């Protein structure tokens, strides 16, 4: 007899709000019935969301924070926008906004500033919530602002949606999970396209790339060639934090289950390194890869960041400049003594490295086990079985399905040859 | 977005009655996580101009400082004056990391030698020590950045802060039925699951029993701005713009967490509570450090004052008040670099301060920092520089000391191999 009911399966998968299963009997008891039910549920967006939060918590952590404009009273028959305080008419300037290039709107001059894309000391992009103090405006075509709060919410949602729908595509089509970290194409809507178009405009200066059909439904489509590495170069990750090392750390932690541990960063070492370097945080620090006390973390962080050298990170927007890219990098595992590989410094190579590490399969199996067993210990024999299977197939749907079946009917059910196929 | 409730005993600890540590111990516990990075200069490690190197700010005149019980604190600590006899401050604690996420896990566990981010938090361990049989050992209040999801053995994740979950529980318990019939329990179990939580039914039922008949506090309305900026407290360096920003931002999250912490402790819902000081963005002051830290620390201290006043007014056991029963630890995951950066902010620093409040403590300010705010070695007996066995204080020492304070058995077996800072105890 099953040890958990179908209703409990729904709780595990986050699909309990869906209508009850259409099964031959209301009280399913066979492995086949459970598999049928689980497979139907795995196709549900609610399940994908549950799984994403378990496997990829970093992609749901932060709002993107494009700044929302406020629409003031119409002036001279045209829409008038400002960010915080309306300005006199004498300070208004006319701009074609990215959301409708066929029209023009009025905006306060100091909130436009199309040429100011960096903070005053040029160390960071206009990324901070306090960035108005750096002199950043909405930028060319108001690319760093949303028309209003509603549009900002849609833009924010599009970033998360791209991650979820691309993961769903991988699950639905039974592509190996490794593709999520190596593929170029993603599933995204018109608003999802906006972020890529903005970066392309900043790179090439051609306003034609901004002519996006914003209401286009999500579909699988390619990205410019620099966007390899699947998830690694999606806006949901690139924009997650202007502190780029935070993002790097999360990759090791969430994809490989390898936490960063402090060994001993000494205050005096840091003071000596940074006392007279006010822009230290935004600079590259490859010297830290060989600095005792720093190297165990920074060997991973700094070499990982090399793969993204062409991008500037930020919560409002990123730009890409191929001139900033570097040729090669390294991949370290647990610490600075654990060099795994060397290769081209691209997101695609980095993604391929992540998924080829033995810790990747083990980490994914561990997380799915945590999800399915709801925190209860996962039997060691089952873990070993699932790790071996997942390392071979990278089939995420099967992993979830088999883990649920094993919890419900026991490992023997899988080893007797009824594992998913 | 995640909050957690730690509920499962994992090798429950019995409380010893003798041994090292304080004469009196807390029977309840609150950890306040100042998420983002506290600048100790604004609170518990203030300096005068001649004590620090040029370019380090803020500095204070003697008249500005709050001096009591051998402590010398920054002006923003003034609201705590009535309670300073219960406060032990430790400065110059080596945390050994400048990463938020690493530091956050360390702060949740109050140690550096993290084995796994899934290990029990200090709030859970303390809850287990204080009340092994409690169905809920520790509650997590307030939003923890998902980066830093609090973890504690078997973890319950939910979509919103735990106080939202509590509101729903208490609503069902108090409004729907007179007694806890099976129907109510099923409803609440459903709520729990709807919230994508993952726990067995037993602790939910036990929690409901404890919540039965408890009055849910109304939403917190606490306008501290009039106090923060009253003429005798306001620092002239706080700009009008900062005051306006403070008022616009409000303090609902912090106050709501304090309010729910009080509710949980006062009503014996859980022996241990973890709460966040609010948004990490507020405290991670890479830009405009001084204005923002000033406002944030003032805000935090006023909230804390409100909380302590409430404890003092709440009956405890044996004729005492809750003030005599609750132990509080306040700290950040990282410190702030002593020098301003190009954006007038302060970057990260691998050293923190901790504030302990509660029974059994020796009031005072321990640990010491030098002219560049680097922690000096201190004597483990006195907590002050000078002695043959001087050593740098570490986060491991704080974790071990807190477990000692609450009477946890065999902290070393849980991986807490720091040293007991006996100087903290009366």
Give the ranges of each region predicted by the language model:
Chain B
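Ligand-binding pockets and gating/stacking loops
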Residues: 1-426
């Amino acid at each position: 007899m099953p040890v958990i009911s179908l209703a409990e399966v729904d709780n595990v998968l986050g699909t309990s709000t869906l209508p009850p299963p259409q099964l031959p009997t209301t009280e399913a008891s066979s492995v086949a019935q459970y598999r049928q039910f689980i497979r139907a549920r795995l196709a549900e967006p609610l399940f994908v969301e549950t799984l994403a939060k378990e496997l990829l918590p970093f992609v749901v952590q932060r709002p993107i924070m494009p700044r929302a404009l406020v629409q003031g009273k119409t002036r001279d028959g045209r829409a008038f926008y400002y960010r915080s305080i309306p300005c006199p008419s004498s300070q208004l300037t006319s701009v074609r906004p990215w959301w409708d290039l066929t029209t023009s709107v009025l905006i306060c001059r100091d909130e436009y500033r199309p040429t100011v894309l960096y903070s005053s000391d040029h160390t960071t992009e206009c990324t901070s919530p306090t960035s108005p103090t750096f002199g950043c405006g909405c930028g060319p075509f108001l690319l760093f602002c949303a028309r209003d709060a509603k549009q900002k919410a849609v833009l924010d949602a599009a970033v998360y949606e791209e991650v979820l729908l691309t993961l769903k595509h991988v699950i639905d089509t039974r592509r190996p999970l490794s593709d999520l970290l190596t593929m170029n194409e993603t599933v995204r809507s018109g608003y999802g396209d906006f972020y890529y178009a903005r970066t392309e405009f900043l790179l090439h200066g051609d306003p034609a790339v901004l002519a996006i059909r914003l209401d286009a439904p999500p579909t699988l489509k390619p990205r410019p060639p620099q966007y390899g590495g699947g998830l690694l170069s999606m806006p949901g990750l690139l924009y997650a934090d202007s502190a780029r090392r935070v993002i790097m750390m999360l990759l090791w932690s969430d994809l490989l289950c390898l936490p960063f541990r402090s060994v001993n960063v000494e205050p005096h070492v840091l003071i000596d390194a940074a006392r007279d370097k006010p822009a230290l945080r935004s600079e590259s620090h490859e010297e830290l890869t060989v600095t005792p006390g720093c190297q165990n973390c920074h060997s991973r962080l700094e070499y990982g960041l090399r793969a993204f050298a062409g991008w500037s990170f930020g919560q409002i927007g990123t730009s890409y400049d191929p001139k900033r890219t570097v040729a090669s990098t390294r991949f370290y595992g647990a610490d600075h003594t654990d060099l795994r590989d060397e290769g081209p410094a691209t997101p695609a190579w980095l993604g391929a490295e992540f998924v080829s590490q033995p810790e990747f399969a083990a980490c994914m199996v561990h997380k799915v086990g945590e999800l399915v067993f709801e925190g209860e210990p996962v039997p060691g024999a089952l873990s070993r079985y699932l790790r071996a299977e997942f390392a071979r197939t990278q089939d995420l749907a099967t992993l979830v399905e088999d883990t649920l079946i094993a919890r419900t009917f026991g490992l023997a059910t899988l080893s007797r040859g009824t594992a998913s196929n | 977005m995640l909050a957690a409730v730690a509920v499962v005993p994992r090798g429950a600890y019995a409380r010893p009655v003798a041994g090292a540590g304080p004469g009196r111990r807390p029977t309840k516990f609150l950890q306040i996580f100042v998420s983002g990075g506290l600048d100790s200069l604004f609170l518990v490690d203030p300096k005068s101009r001649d004590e620090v190197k040029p370019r380090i700010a803020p500095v204070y005149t003697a008249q500005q400082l709050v001096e009591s019980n051998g402590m010398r604190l920054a002006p923003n600590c003034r609201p705590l004056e009535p309670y300073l006899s219960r406060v032990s401050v430790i400065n110059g604690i080596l945390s050994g990391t400048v990463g938020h996420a690493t530091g956050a896990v360390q702060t949740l566990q109050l140690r550096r030698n993290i084995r796994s981010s899934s290990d029990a938090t200090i709030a859970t361990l303390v809850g287990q020590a204080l009340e092994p049989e409690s169905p809920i050992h520790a509650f997590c209040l307030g939003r923890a950045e998902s980066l830093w999801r609090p973890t504690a053995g078997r973890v319950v994740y939910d979509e919103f802060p735990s106080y939202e979950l509590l509101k729903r529980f208490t609503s069902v318990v108090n409004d729907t039925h007179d007694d806890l019939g099976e129907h109510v329990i099923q409803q609440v179990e459903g709520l729990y699951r709807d919230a994508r939580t993952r726990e067995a039914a037993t602790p939910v039922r036990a929690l409901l029993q404890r919540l039965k008949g408890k009055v849910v506090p109304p939403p917190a309305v606490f306008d501290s701005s009039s106090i923060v900026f009253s003429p005798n407290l306001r620092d002239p360096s706080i700009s009008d713009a900062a005051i306006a920003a403070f008022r616009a931002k409000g303090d609902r999250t912090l106050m709501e967490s304090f309010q729910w912490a009080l509710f949980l402790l006062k009503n014996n819902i859980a022996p241990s509570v973890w709460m966040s000081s609010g948004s990490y963005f507020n405290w991670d002051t890479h830009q405009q450090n001084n204005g923002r830290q000033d406002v944030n620390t003032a805000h935090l201290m006023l909230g804390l004052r409100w909380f302590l006043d409430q404890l003092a007014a709440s009956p405890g056991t044996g004729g005492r008040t809750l003030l005599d029963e609750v132990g509080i630890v306040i700290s950040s995951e990282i410190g702030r670099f002593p020098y301003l950066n190009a954006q007038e902010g302060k970057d990260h620093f691998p050293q923190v301060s901790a504030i302990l409040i509660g029974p059994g403590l020796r009031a005072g300010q321990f640990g010491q920092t030098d002219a560049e705010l680097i922690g000096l070695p201190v004597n483990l007996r006195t907590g002050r520089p000078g002695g043959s066995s001087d050593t740098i204080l570490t986060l491991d020492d704080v974790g071990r000391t807190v477990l000692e304070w609450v009477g946890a058995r065999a902290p070393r077996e849980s991986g807490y191999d720091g040293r007991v800072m006996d100087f903290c105890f009366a």
